[in-house]
Amino acid sequence: MIEIPSDFSEQTAKFTQILAKFNRVHSLTNYKNFDEQISDSISPLKWLKFYPETAIDVGSGAGFPAIFLAMILKDCRWWLFEPNAKKSSFLSYVKAELNLKNVSVKSCKIEACEPFVAQLITSRALMKTKELLKICRGFYDNETQILLYKGSSVEGELDGLDAQIYGVKNRNYVFLNVKRDWKENE
């Protein structure tokens, strides 16, 4: 079982202050209740069956879920891919302010980077599942766990995929096991 570190509340309070300040100027997110988003970010950890050493977050935006997962999974090396310059600058600032040494921010689309295999890939409401798998090709292998934060209607996106879905309120947490040689028309 993955435990919440003792400094998590302090870290999330700092994050919330930083995001509120940046959001007034840069409109990084439309979320009003950051505590709900933080809770949503960490909720699927109870179903994660292993402690990853390497993880990728695709389309990291304002840091949900990756920043909070990185706060908890401190021994995991995180790469956050965010092509939007103001959002990636914000993420870099948060990384420095919160001293998140296990986080690297990549200011580019994942498909523009040299592939490397991660043990965990996360993404929150970025795009359709099979499109995400296409752009992440080369970053996963048969052992990689993919965790997607999806809305209430996700089943049609998962045809032909090995998926476990955990539903909470209007959120579906989808854990995928995808073979490295997965093809869209399988």
Swiss-Prot record:
Enzyme class: transferase
Subcellular location: Cytoplasm
Disulfide bond entries: none
EC number: 2.1.1.170
Pfam families listed in its UniProt record: GidB (PF02527)
Record: residues binding S-adenosyl-L-methionine: 59, 64, 110-111, 124
Main location: cytoplasm
Coiled-coil ranges from the UniProt annotation: none
Signal sequence residues: none
GO-annotated cellular components: cytosol
Catalysed reaction, written as an equation: guanosine(527) in 16S rRNA + S-adenosyl-L-methionine = N(7)-methylguanosine(527) in 16S rRNA + S-adenosyl-L-homocysteine
Keywords, alphabetical: Cytoplasm, Methyltransferase, rRNA processing, S-adenosyl-L-methionine, Transferase
InterPro entries (UniProt xref): rRNA_ssu_MeTfrase_G, SAM-dependent_MTases_sf
GO MF terms, alphabetically ordered: rRNA (guanine-N7-)-methyltransferase activity
Function: Specifically methylates the N7 position of guanine in position 527 of 16S rRNA.
Family membership: Belongs to the methyltransferase superfamily. RNA methyltransferase RsmG family.
PANTHER family, A to Z: S-ADENOSYL-L-METHIONINE-DEPENDENT METHYLTRANSFERASES SUPERFAMILY PROTEIN
Protein name: Ribosomal RNA small subunit methyltransferase G
Annotated organism of origin: Campylobacter curvus (strain 525.92)
